[in-house]
Amino acid sequence: MTEIIKDLYQFTEVMEPIKLSMHQYLLMTNEPVLIQTGAVSQAQTTIPKLQELLGERKIKYILISHFESDECGGLALVLKEHPEAVAVCSETTARQLMGFGITNNVLIKKPNEIFAGDDFEFQTISYPCEMHMWEGLLFFEKKRGIFFSSDLMFGMGENHGQVIESSWDAAVKSSGADTLPNQESGQKLSSDLSEIEPKFVASGHGFCITIVG
C-alpha cells in the first residue's frame, strides 16, 4: 500500500500474465471511505492492511462504480470485518448487490448528486458501464479535487504508486469516454467530465495523474 497523496492510500493487485494493475483506495477521513474492494483475492490481501491503517476505526462507506469483480467482488469479505459499512452506488448496481444477496445496506445515488460526510464531499457522474450500458457512477471528491476514474483513463502494466502529469483536457480526450458503444453516451460523459476541475486522478487501472496547466 502507498499513501499516493495526502489522506489517500492505494492498494494494488497485478493480474498475471497480462500485467494489469487493479487499484483500490482508502480515503482516510474521520468517516473512512473505501473506493472499490477489488476481487476476492485482492480483498483477502487488502483487509489486513486496512486494519493496520484504521486501528479501531471502521470503514463507513464503500463506493462502487459498477458491478464487476475488480470493483466489488470482495465486498462480502470486507463487510464481514466492517458490517456497518454502507455501499454507495447507482440504482442498477444496487439491484445487483441485493439480487445476488451480497448486501441490502446501500445508499443509491443518481448522477450529479452530492454525497457528503465528515471531511469529504463527493459529486457523482453518470457512467454508462453496467450491463446493457445501464448507469453506473464515477466519483469526484470535491474538497481534495480527486477524481476516481474507474475504467476510464485505462492503462496496462505494473504501476502501483506511480504518478504522471497531464492537463485535464488531455486526460479527458484520452480517457476512452468517446469509445463507448453508444456514441451519444460517450459524448455526454466527455462533456460531464469537462465540467469538473480535478487536481488528481486516482486511476482504477494504470498511472495516477497529477493535473497540471
Which residue ranges define each predicted feature?
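Short, glycine/acidic-enriched loop or turn micro-motifs at the edges of active sites
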Residues: 39-40, 69, 154, 208
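Active-site metal-binding motif and surrounding structural segment of the metallo-beta-lactamase
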Residues: 42-88
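Short beta->alpha connector loops
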Residues: 16-18, 40-42, 68-70, 128-132
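Metallo-beta-lactamase
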Residues: 88-212
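Active-site neighborhood of phospho(di)ester-bond hydrolases with catalytic His/Asp-centered motifs
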Residues: 35-37, 59-67, 87-91, 147-151, ...
